[in-house]
């Protein structure tokens, strides 16, 4: 059987194999959007459970807390911390990169901490704090954004 000639530079092109269907890019393959959704969902849950663990630790180790509330806070902190790590590891397995998962968990943790701080302790955040949250959100959208690939032609060798 004769071998088909390849393109210059040793790269494989789709025209060399006309019977083989072209594959979709990874972000358009079947189930990729579902995996991305579950990755983001698990990371958002991990951030929320992390904030809940921190809030329960603050309740448990407060200065005016009874012994029963302290024990309950430690139990809630340990269980929500283990749930946070479970959801984070699941989010890592579903995500396309660990950077996306880490930034998503961080953003979710910050917003959940602000919400729980307001509900449980009456804390209000300053404008500078919300500016930092906005910058984190901008970074998150830049990381999640999929830019089209830029293909550079291979330089031809001069003989």
From Swiss-Prot:
SUPFAM superfamilies per UniProt: Multidrug resistance efflux transporter EmrE (SSF103481)
TM region(s), chain numbering: 37-57, 59-79, 100-120, 124-144
InterPro entries: TMEM42 (IPR039632)
Membrane topology annotation: Multi-pass membrane protein
Superkingdom field: Eukaryota
Localization of this protein: Membrane
One term under GO cellular component: membrane
Keyword field: Membrane, Transmembrane, Transmembrane helix
Primary location group: membrane
Identification of the protein by name: Transmembrane protein 42
Organism from which the protein derives: Pongo abelii (Sumatran orangutan)
Taxonomic placement: Eukaryota, Metazoa, Chordata, Craniata, Vertebrata
Protein encoded by which gene: TMEM42
């Amino acid at each position: 059987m004769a071998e088909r000639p390849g393109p210059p530079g040793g790269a494989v092109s789709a025209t060399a194999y006309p019977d083989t269907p072209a594959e979709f890019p990874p972000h358009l393959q079947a189930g990729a959007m579902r995996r991305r959704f579950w990755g983001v969902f698990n990371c958002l849950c991990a951030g929320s459970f992390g904030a809940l663990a921190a809030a329960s630790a603050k309740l448990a180790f407060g200065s005016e807390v009874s012994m029963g509330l302290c024990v309950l806070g430690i139990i809630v902190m340990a269980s929500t911390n283990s749930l946070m790590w479970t959801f984070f590891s699941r989010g890592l397995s579903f995500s396309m990169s660990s950077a996306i998962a880490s930034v998503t968990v961080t953003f979710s943790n910050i917003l959940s901490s602000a919400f729980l701080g307001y509900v449980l302790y009456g804390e209000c955040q300053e404008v500078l704090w919300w500016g930092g949250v906005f910058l984190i959100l901008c970074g998150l959208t830049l990381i999640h954004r999929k830019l089209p690939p830029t293909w550079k032609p291979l330089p031809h060798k001069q003989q």
